[in-house]
A protein has these predicted regions:
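Acidic-basic catalytic patches of nuclease active cores, encompassing PD-(D/E)XK
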Residues: 1-52, 61-63, 95-100, 309-311, ...
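Conserved catalytic cores of phosphodiester-cleaving nucleases, focusing on short active-site segments
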Residues: 44-79, 85-88
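Domain-level recognition of nuclease-like catalytic cores that cleave nucleotide substrates
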Residues: 105-171
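Short alpha-helical segments that sit at the start of domains
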Residues: 165-206
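A short acidic, leucine-rich amphipathic alpha-helix
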Residues: 209-217, 223
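Short amphipathic alpha-helical interaction segments
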Residues: 224-247
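A short, conserved structural fragment
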Residues: 240-261
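Phospho-regulated, low-complexity intrinsically disordered regions of nuclear gene-regulatory
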Residues: 256-321
Length: 321
């Protein structure tokens, strides 16, 4: 089995989250939780004197007076930016922990370290890039069998030793956050369509956008509140677009928008709906997802003139902070 595997940034994020949970999963060691780290933020922008800073994941330990900030570069790691790394290089620890709301026993002596997370196959070129451009960030590399630290040691000697010895990972870790800005519409549909069906089969024939976003986006409610609002807004907009398209295409007989109550209404499918009706709904789901995967064009909404709003544009605003 090769140790090389290309993970997306979202997959890298989920692997790291699994290393921070109280539950130890068979395929990933929860070393950050064991050492007292807790997740502070996920994809959240913080405006500092050196510009806007947005780490993919921020962990902090009050007992160790130390914060670890991860910049993840998935797949080919081709989006490493000098501007971004310069911002991290010149970041004031005291200013950042204050603006980010990080609890520190001693803010003056608190240490903050930026770590670049990449796929193992990109380790050599990332090391060469750092040498060439004058950066000195630790690199956390992810393979299908190992997770290891290189280039520079971490400020936390216990974590550093565990990572130098390598943390093993086999298979795919649990998924906590299911979407990000780069997720395809079909990724959302794979989770949203079965959820809509499950609503109806337990007697819930109306649902809000907020309800389905909460149910399909993030599996852990505690994490939902610390995800950056711009990322959540992008997911909300994709969910809205998905529901609109469903109601105009394969699901036009099953899904409609109730402008008065600001909710979506499920038709035909319910607790006692006939199995042939249920099968037809499920078939519509497969056809819809197949069209998304194959990028087959959908119909244009001819009822809305250019520059005008449709009734779907008045979907309820969500609290995404």
């Amino acid at each position: 089995m090769t140790s090389l595997q290309s993970y997306s940034e979202l997959e890298l994020l989920n692997i790291l989250i699994s290393m921070c949970t109280s539950n130890k999963f068979p395929n990933v060691d929860n070393i950050f939780f064991q050492e007292g780290y807790r997740i502070v933020s996920i994809d959240r922008s913080v405006t500092t004197g050196s510009g806007s800073v947005k780490y993919d994941l921020v962990l902090s330990s009050q007992n160790k007076n130390l914060t670890l900030c991860f910049e993840l570069k998935g797949l080919k790691a081709s989006n490493i930016s000098k501007e971004q790394l310069n911002r991290y290089k010149g970041l004031s620890t005291e200013e950042y922990i204050r603006l980010a709301g990080i609890q520190a026993n001693n803010a003056i002596n608190h240490k903050l370290q930026t770590i670049i997370g990449i796929n193992l196959e990109n380790l050599l070129k990332t090391e060469e890039y750092q040498v060439r451009e004058g950066y000195n960030f630790p690199i956390l590399s992810f393979g299908s069998q190992t997770i290891s630290i290189s280039f520079k040691e971490l400020n936390d000697s216990e974590i550093n030793q565990k990572l130098i010895k390598t943390v093993s990972t086999i298979g795919t870790p649990p998924t906590f956050i299911h979407f990000d800005k780069e997720s395809r519409m079909s990724d959302l549909a794979y989770r949203a369509i079965p959820k809509i069906y499950s609503y109806a089969k337990v007697g819930t024939t109306m649902f809000t956008v907020e309800q389905i976003v909460n149910d399909v986006y993030c599996s852990v409610k505690e994490l939902h509140s610390i995800i950056g609002p711009d990322v959540k807004k992008a997911v909300v907009n994709k969910i809205k677009s998905l529901l609109r398209q469903m109601s105009k295409e394969e699901f036009k007989d099953y899904l409609s928008w109730n402008g008065k109550d600001k909710c979506w209404v499920i038709s035909k499918i319910h607790v006692e709906s006939h199995h042939t009706t249920d099968f037809a709904f499920q078939k519509a789901g497969r056809n819809f997802i197949e069209r998304l995967d194959k990028e087959i064009p959908f119909k244009i909404d001819k009822d809305v003139l250019q520059g005008q709003l449709s009734l779907f544009d008045e979907l309820e605003p969500l609290d995404i902070n």
